[in-house]
Swiss-Prot record:
It comes from Microcystis aeruginosa (strain NIES-843 / IAM M-2473). It comes from the Bacteria. The lineage of its organism: Bacteria, Bacillati, Cyanobacteriota, Cyanophyceae, Oscillatoriophycideae. Keywords: Cytoplasm, Lipid A biosynthesis, Lipid biosynthesis, Lipid metabolism, Lyase. It catalyses: a (3R)-hydroxyacyl-[ACP] = a (2E)-enoyl-[ACP] + H2O. This is 3-hydroxyacyl-[acyl-carrier-protein] dehydratase FabZ.
Length: 159
């Protein structure tokens, strides 16, 4: 390797492909009890992210949903996917520090219950981003490889 090649290699930006919970907290405004992503385990800039949520019996929603058979509410599964989508959006050029609001869901289905002890793996893909204002994404959540939920999500930027 020549000196020039070494210098160019050092100048190439390092593409981040994972995010810790601390890094996610720097990107998203959500806090307990509404921070629903523990880690981003795979990230392709401008395209997709895979996040995980460790579902424990200590989640604040389990005592009321449902007392004798704790289930993670479907709306929180969708919110978890939306937060993974939020990580994708915050990493787009010019979007750092912007606030993205969840603007809608379509074609959402729940396929299996999510219960304490499950690890929810959420894959979210960016389908479109129009005029740097409206984003559309496709998400799915799996537990042990089984589809738990899927749907399309819309986001809007608030300045």
């Amino acid at each position: 390797m020549t000196i020039v090649t070494e210098a160019l290699t050092e100048l190439e930006p390092v593409i981040k492909t994972t995010f810790t919970v601390e890094e996610i907290r720097q990107l998203l405004p959500h806090r307990y009890p509404f921070a629903l992503v523990d880690r981003i385990i795979d990230y392709v800039p401008g395209q997709k992210a895979v996040g995980l949520k460790n579902v424990t019996i200590n989640e604040p929603f389990f005592p009321g949903h449902i007392p004798n058979r704790p289930l993670m509410p479907g709306v929180l599964i969708v919110e978890s996917m939306a937060q993974v989508g939020g990580v994708i959006l915050t990493q787009l050029p010019g979007m750092k520090g912007k606030f993205f609001a969840f603007a809608g869901i379509d074609k959402t289905r729940f396929r299996r219950p999510v219960v304490p002890g499950d690890q929810l793996i959420m894959t979210v893909e960016l389908l479109s981003f129009k005029m740097n204002k409206i984003a559309k994404m496709q998400g799915e959540a799996r537990v042990d490889g089984q589809l738990a939920a899927q749907g399309e999500m819309m986001f809007s930027i608030f300045d």
